[in-house]
Structures are given as structure tokens and as C-alpha cells.
Amino acid sequence: MTASSSGCGGLPVSQCPSYSSLSKLFFMDSSYDSYYCEEPEERQTASIRERKRMCSINVAFIELRNYIPTFPYEKRLSKIDTLNLAIAYINMLDDVLRTPEDSGQYIQKCVHMARTGQIGAPAWSTSDLLARLNWIKWRRLGIEPIA
């Protein structure tokens, strides 16, 4: 197939709509030696799929934000902040489950190590998570506040 061959619903590529912006519409065929213009229906279907995909990703981020500690004044965390906080929070919860120590004492020890710059503090204790943990109303949860 050449640039003048059919590829746009039977039309020659040179007569495809938006010929001036073909770089956005061209895709290589399986032989990688010729180009064709994508059908409008296929493009529309692909756009719908992409919108659905982005919508499901956004819904997943909204759900994830419900499970990580946030500041009361924050409207919404960015996606990267959400992921970083989720990773730190999961690591903290994993450490709490694995330690033979009392959970509250273990967290207080880790927080103290991080605040005093001691080597050996868990990676999650140096993250933004510590600042957020200070906003939690621990007494309402029946837990002594983290010092």
C-alpha cells in the first residue's frame, strides 16, 4: 500500500478528512510499510473505551483516597500523592501486623526514631504519612495519641 492507496473507507489517503493533520490519524499496518487512515467509527469506539478506562481509574483513586489518612483541610489529593501515601500506609500497617510489640508502642517508637533522625526508622515513617497521622483523633478511636 502506498500513500495514495485506499485506506479511509475506500478513499485515497490523500482525500481523507483532516489531511493536514494526518500525523495524528495515521497508524501503520501489520507490514509496517504502509499507512492508512483510521475509520471514524473505530476512532469513536476507541475514544469511548478510553473514556470508560479513565473513568474507572478515577473511581479507583476516589475509593483509595477514602482509606488513607488526610488532613481535614485538604480538598483532594493528587494521584501521585494518593499513591505515595497509600504505599506508606500499607507499609506501616504491614509493619504493625508483623511486629511482636504492642501496635501503639511500636508506632510511637518508629515516630520517635524518625523525628530524632535515628538510623533504622522504617521507610514509611519518613513520609508525609507521619504528619497526617498527627491529625487523627486517636482518643475517639480508643487509642493513646502518638507522641
Curated annotation (Swiss-Prot):
GO annotation terms (biological process): cell differentiation; dauer exit; developmental process; regulation of transcription by RNA polymerase II; response to oxidative stress
Matching Gene3D superfamilies: Helix-loop-helix DNA-binding domain
Tissue: Expressed in hermaphrodite dopaminergic neurons (ADE, CEP, and PDE).
GO cellular component: cytoplasm; nucleus
Key words, A-Z: Cytoplasm, Developmental protein, Differentiation, DNA-binding, Nucleus, Transcription, Transcription regulation
Entries under PROSITE patterns matching the protein: BHLH
Loss of function: phenotype: Faster exit from L1 arrest and IIS-dependent dauer diapause.
Family matches, as InterPro entries: bHLH_dom, E-box_TF_Regulators, HLH_DNA-bd_sf
Induction: Induced by daf-16.
Keyword Transmembrane part of the UniProt annotation: no
SMART domains: HLH
Compartment(s): Nucleus; Cytoplasm
bHLH domain boundaries: 41-93
Keyword Nucleus appears in the UniProt entry: yes
Purpose of the protein: Transcriptional activator. Shown to have a role in the negative regulation of exit from L1 arrest and dauer diapause dependent on IIS signaling (insulin and insulin-like growth factor (IGF) signaling). Hypodermal expression is regulated by IIS/daf-16 while neuronal expression is not under the control of IIS/daf-16.
Protein's name in the database: Helix-loop-helix protein 13
Gene coding for it: hlh-13
